[in-house]
Amino acid sequence: MGGEILNAAILSFGLIFVGWGLGALLLKIQGGEE
C-alpha cells in the first residue's frame, strides 16, 4: 500500500515538473524569436 502511494506521488510530481519545464522552454523560444 505504501509503495503505491509513493509511486503515485512520484508520478504526479514528475508530470508537474515536465509540464513546468515545457512551459518554461516554450516561453524562452517565444521570447527569443520576438
Curated annotation (Swiss-Prot):
Which compartments does it reside in? Cellular thylakoid membrane
Which regions span the lipid bilayer? 9-27
List the disulfide bonds in this chain. Answer: none
Q: Which family does it belong to?
A: Belongs to the PetM family.
User: Which source organism?
Assistant: Nostoc punctiforme (strain ATCC 29133 / PCC 73102)
Fill in the subunit field for this protein.
Answer: The 4 large subunits of the cytochrome b6-f complex are cytochrome b6, subunit IV (17 kDa polypeptide, PetD), cytochrome f and the Rieske protein, while the 4 small subunits are PetG, PetL, PetM and PetN. The complex functions as a dimer.
Its GO biological process annotations read: photosynthesis
Q: Which Gene Ontology cellular-component terms appear in the entry?
A: cytochrome b6f complex; plasma membrane-derived thylakoid membrane
Q: Which GO terms describe its molecular function?
A: electron transfer activity
Pfam families associated with the record:
PetM
| Name assigned to this protein | Cytochrome b6-f complex subunit 7
